[in-house]
């Protein structure tokens, strides 16, 4: 048997190795993040953050929440792909996929594998196109990664995936193996084509919602105003301004007409004549379709984020009323927040949920009058245990925003 020979590197050999390394194509290397976590973004003047804990402590809490989320829900999906485990049986949905792509791009810098995860999530998205528009994502897959329950899209997943790609362009640039910016623009244009009702300039429920029953319906949890502004900035498509303006109009119409005492928004909205109103029971998902339930619980986070990032005050009255109502309703204790309310404030839920209390922390950031309430929501959220994919995702994003670590395109 031959004996191994020892290696000794001459200076020439070292130079050759270094030259070979430099000749490796850029597509095989990952870029250093331009906006590593934590970012400590300056939000709109007059807005607040929790002031009973240090910035370092908030950053550490977000890191811990991310580590827990990643361990529980971010999973491999074959070679070179990742997905977000939505249910214990292994099913996933495009909503979850969008959350995964957003979280990985935001946590880059702290998490050294963030770009690997992001690119793997992108490849999974590419492998599951909607049957109606191939740039959008089929909304649900089973544990074998096969499309189930219809291969069409859901608007919220489409929007988060597109927005995450814009952030990825800012985070890592688009000169590597994936042109993040172009991919994002492609999805944005597909959203305009298939997820926007261009006769009303409203967001559809998905690319499937074109018949008379659903074509004029919309879902307030999709009212991601800052996403819409980023879409316009990235593409230069002025039509996005129509969608932004109409979305704010609907928020204020619902607030003035149906929830002036609470500021709450319903899960689903329909057009009746020329008026947008809460959907009736069992419109799409269940008895609480016209109430503040498991879709619209995200609206304090989604809508308030645009105010924090841009200062756009068109929904500020609605947000302020909601902040005042909920803090009084629960006597300043987020543990008393229930998982469901009618728009008049009557409780419909039976218990507590992080999906409901955490987003109220984001909306509380609009004014210093909410400081004690915001501090309480932060403490409750940061100290919470795992509940499930949906609750834990919303808690993570709410904490990212509350800690001052959200940023935009």
UniProtKB/Swiss-Prot annotation:
**Top EC class for this record:** hydrolase
* Alphabetical list of Pfam families matching this protein: Glyco_hydro_8 (PF01270)
Q: State if Signal is listed as a keyword.
A: yes
Q: Which residues form the signal peptide?
A: 1-31
UniProt-listed GO biological process terms: carbohydrate metabolic process
* Active-site residues per Swiss-Prot or TrEMBL entry: 95, 156
Which superkingdom is the protein from? Bacteria
- GO molecular function, a single term: licheninase activity
- Under Enzyme Commission nomenclature, its number is 3.2.1.73
> Which keywords does this Swiss-Prot/TrEMBL entry list?
Glycosidase, Hydrolase, Signal
Q: Which reaction does it catalyse?
A: Hydrolysis of (1->4)-beta-D-glucosidic linkages in beta-D-glucans containing (1->3)- and (1->4)-bonds
Per the record, the similarity remark reads:
Belongs to the glycosyl hydrolase 8 (cellulase D) family.
Q: What is this protein called?
A: Beta-glucanase
The organism is: Niallia circulans (Bacillus circulans)
